[in-house]
C-alpha cells in the first residue's frame, strides 16, 4: 500500500524472527540453516516481509521471502490478514496465467512459530520503483530513466493487468467475493464501508470520506461489467523489474473479484497520488508517465474491453486510499508520531484531490 513518510511499522525484531524461523524450518527440512536474515527497506505497513536464505542440499528454495501477517501490537492497518487467501491467490495466478508470480512454497497457519500466520515464497531479484520518496521525485532510477525506458516499463506494466484480467478464469476468483448481497461491485464497496467504520470506531469520522461515498452513489455505473480477478494493489510499486522488464508481481493481499475498472482505477489514481504530491512540493514529477488516457487506451487495445465509468472508479480508488491514509494517520498518533487535528480530513494527504473528485473538477 502506498504511503507518505514512513511511520513505525512493527514491534518485531528480525533477529528474533530469524531464530524462530530456523526452529520452524528444521521441522520441515531437518538440518536446514536460515542465514542472511534481513528486512527490506520498503517493508510495508500491512503484511511484513522477511528476506532470508536457506542452506540445505535438498532445499526447494534457496533465496526466500517470507510474508508475515501484521503484528497486532503495531496497530494494524487492516482488521484481518488472511495469509492462506494470499497464498492461494498467488498459486492460482501462477497456474492460470503467464504473469511472473513468485513460487509459493510453505504456508503456516498456526501463529505459534512466528507470532502470526505466514507463507514462504521464492525471492525475486531486481529493483522496485520506490514509494518513499516516491519514484516521481528526483533522485531514483525510474525518474532518471529516459522517456523511452519509462515508456517500456509502462507498456510492460499495463500488459500485466490486461493479461491477468484476460487469462485468469473468472469463476476461479469467486471465492474472493465478500459475504452479503448484491453484485460484486456492490459487495466490494460495502466491504470498504465496513472497513471505514472500523477505522473510525471511537474516533472522529471524516466528512470528506462520507461525501465521497455519497458521490459514488450518484456516479454508480448503469452497467458494472463482468467481474474478474483483480490484483488489488495494482501499481508499479508492487512489481520487481529487471531493468524495465517485470520479473515478479507482488502483494496480492487486496486481491478481489470485481470489475476490471476497479484495478485500472487504482493503477491510474495511485500514480496520480504520487504525481500530485510531487508537484505540491515544487517538482515537476513525471507528468507524461502513466497518464490516465494512455492507460485506458492501451488497456482497451490489449483486451478489447474499453474502460468505462472511470470517473467513478478513480474516485473510488482515491476514496479507498483515503481510508487507508486515515488509518495510518491514527496509527501514527497511536505511536506518538503525529498530533490528531480537530479536522480529521487534514490527516488525508490527498484531501484536496479527493475533494476535487467529489466536486467533479479533478479531471
Segments and roles (model prediction):
Residues 2-34:
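Juxta-kinase regulatory segment immediately upstream of eukaryotic protein kinase catalytic domains
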Residues 305, 309, 320-363:
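Helical subdomain adjoining the active site within ATP-dependent kinase catalytic cores
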Residues 38-209, 219-224:
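ATP-binding pocket architecture of kinase catalytic cores
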Residues 262-303, 317-335:
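Active-site activation/catalytic loop segments of kinase-like enzymes and analogous catalytic loops
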Residues 229-231, 236:
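Catalytic-loop of the protein kinase fold
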Residues 227-229, 247:
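Conserved protein kinase catalytic-loop anchor
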Residues 240-266:
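Catalytic activation segment of kinase domains across protein kinase-like and atypical kinase folds
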Amino acid at each position: 500500500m502506498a504511503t507518505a513518510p514512513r511511520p513505525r511499522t512493527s514491534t518485531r525484531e528480525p533477529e528474533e524472527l530469524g531464530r524462530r524461523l530456523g526452529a520452524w524450518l528444521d521441522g520441515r527440512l531437518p538440518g536446514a540453516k536460515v542465514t542472511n536474515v534481513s528486512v527490506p527497506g520498503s517493508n510495508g505497513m500491512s503484511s511484513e516481509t522477511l528476506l532470508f536464505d536457506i542452506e540445505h542440499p535438498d532445499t526447494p528454495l534457496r533465496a526466500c521471502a517470507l510474508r508475515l501477517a501484521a503484528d497486532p501490537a503495531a496497530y494494524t492497518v487492516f482488521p484481518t490478514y488472511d495469509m492462506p487467501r494470499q497464498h492461494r491467490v498467488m498459486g492460482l495466478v501462477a497456474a492460470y496465467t503467464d504473469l511472473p508470480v513468485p513460487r509459493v512454497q510453505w504456508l503456516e497457519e498456526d501463529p505459534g512459530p512466528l507470532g502470526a500466520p505466514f507463507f514462504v515464497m521464492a525471492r525475486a531479484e531486481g529493483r522496485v520503483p520506490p514509494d518513499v520518496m516516491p519514484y516521481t521525485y528526483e533522485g531514483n532510477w525510474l525518474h532518471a530513466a529516459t522517456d523511452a525506458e519509462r515508456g517500456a516499463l509502462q507498456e510492460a506494466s499495463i500488459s500485466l493487468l490486461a493479461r491477468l484480467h484476460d487469462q485468469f478464469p473468472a469463476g476461479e476468483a469467486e471465492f474472493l467475493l465478500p459475504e452479503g448481497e448484491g453484485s460484486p461491485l456492490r459487495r466490494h464497496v460495502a466491504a470498504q464501508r465496513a472497513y471505514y467504520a472500523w477505522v473510525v470506531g471511537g474516533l472522529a469520522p471524516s466528512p470528506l470520506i462520507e461525501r465521497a461515498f455519497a458521490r459514488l452513489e450518484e456516479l454508480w455505473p448503469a452497467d458494472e461489467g463482468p467481474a474478474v480477478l483483480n490484483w488489488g494493489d495494482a501499481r508499479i510499486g508492487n512489481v520487481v523489474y529487471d531493468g524495465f522488464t517485470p520479473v515478479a508481481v507482488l502483494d496480492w493481499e487486496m486481491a478481489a473479484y470485481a470489475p476490471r475498472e476497479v484495478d485500472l482505477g487504482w493503477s491510474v489514481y495511485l500514480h496520480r497520488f504520487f504525481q500530485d504530491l510531487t508537484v505540491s512540493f515544487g517538482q515537476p514529477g513525471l507528468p507524461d508517465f502513466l497518464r490516465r488516457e494512455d492507460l485506458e487506451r492501451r488497456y482497451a487495445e490489449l483486451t478489447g474491453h474499453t474502460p468505462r465509468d472511470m470517473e467513478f472508479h478513480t474516485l473510488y480508488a482515491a476514496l479507498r486510499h483515503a481510508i487507508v491514509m486515515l488509518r495510518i494517520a491514527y496509527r501514527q498518533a497511536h505511536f506518538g508520531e503525529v498530533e490528531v487535528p480537530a479536522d480529521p480530513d487534514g490527516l488525508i494527504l490527498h484531501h484536496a484531490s479527493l475533494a476535487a473528485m467529489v466536486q467533479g473538477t479533478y479531471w
